[in-house]
From Swiss-Prot:
Residue stretches spanning the membrane: none
A Pfam cross-reference name: Hydrophobin_2
Protein name: Class II hydrophobin FOXG_02746
Induction info: Expression occurs during infection and is directly regulated by the transcription factor FTF2.
Disulfide-bonded cysteines: C29-C79, C40-C70, C41-C53, C80-C92
Protein family according to the UniProt entry: Belongs to the cerato-ulmin hydrophobin family.
Secretion signal, residue range per the UniProt entry: 1-17
Amino acid sequence: MQFYTIVSLFLAGTAYALPATSANGYEACPSGGLFGNPQCCSLNLVGVLSGDCRAPTKTPNSAKEFQAICAESGQKARCCGLSEILELGAFCQKPVGVSA
């Protein structure tokens, strides 16, 4: 019985995405809050609700690079919560240092 409890806790702990931190220490979306998942989103409703979000193709080294990575696919850099559900970044905000 204890074995199943330990395995369940381990699997639950690994289900959370690790923050994408670059080699120089830049963290696109600081973890620990609602907006901890870096995403590239193409839909944006009223500045908070976003859709069609996907993880960046590589780990950005700066806010400017994060913006450029997303712009390559016609999307905008965002920090989102609930991004794993049907590719819908339900709650997103603009990362610090990103202009658009």
